[in-house]
Amino acid sequence: MVKEMKETINIFNTKTTEEVAQYLLGMYLEHETATGVLGGYIVDAEAYLGPDDEAAHSFGLRKTPRLQAMYDKPGTIYLYTMHTHLILNMVTQEQGKPQGVMIRAIEPVEGVDKMIENRQGRQGVELTNGPGKLVAALGIDKQLYGQSIFSSSLRLVPEKRKFPKKIEALPRIGIPNKGRWTELPLRYVVAGNPYISKQKRTAVDQIDFGWKDEENEKSNNAHILRGTT
């Protein structure tokens, strides 16, 4: 456990933001709440490259009170509100270099019934197939802003991770009129996972959900899609 977390922290400290985004696919994201532990596998993530990225909040080294966490150390949780939805990001570069990864979707695993309750009864792929949806499902709130994704109640659990068969790189969603930054393939997804939004139904891997065929990786997938535990 300690070894795996050290490796994860090292990735955040030494790799590019694009590499960290891809590394996070298959990573287990867990939130310990007062009513139990909720968690799942990250399947969709977008890289934001800071001062040069016209779609990034920190474009041009913009600094506001809301952006303070983006300038903190790797692994810092950056939360912001968009259209009433709270969005989860993680800082991926050294302090003072404001780059990060937005988590767009997870495949829910633990505490699914509570996630459904948190989402007012929504279930199946609609439970966590968007950035605001997964934050609501996991019960994430603004109190986590500025805390560490390695050691807070919301944390990465590398010893539980899975590995994608294939990673696809796509343009980010909802980035209009930003020149080349609109089309750059900075969104990374687990190809074939049903919790990926805006994909053809025929592209979904109904057997393995896009994961490599390793021990225990096929267990109990179908019941989650049906929204049952």
Swiss-Prot record:
Gene Ontology terms describing biological process: base-excision repair
EC number: 3.2.2.-
Record Pfam families: Pur_DNA_glyco (PF02245)
InterPro entries reported in the protein's UniProt record: Formyl_transferase-like_C_sf, MPG, MPG_sf
Entry keywords, A to Z: DNA damage, DNA repair, Hydrolase
Membrane-spanning ranges: none
Keyword Disulfide bond among UniProt keywords: no
A molecular-function term among this protein's GO annotations: DNA binding
Family classification: Belongs to the DNA glycosylase MPG family.
Xref: HAMAP family: 3MGH
Record protein name field: Putative 3-methyladenine DNA glycosylase
Species of the source: Enterococcus faecalis (strain ATCC 700802 / V583)
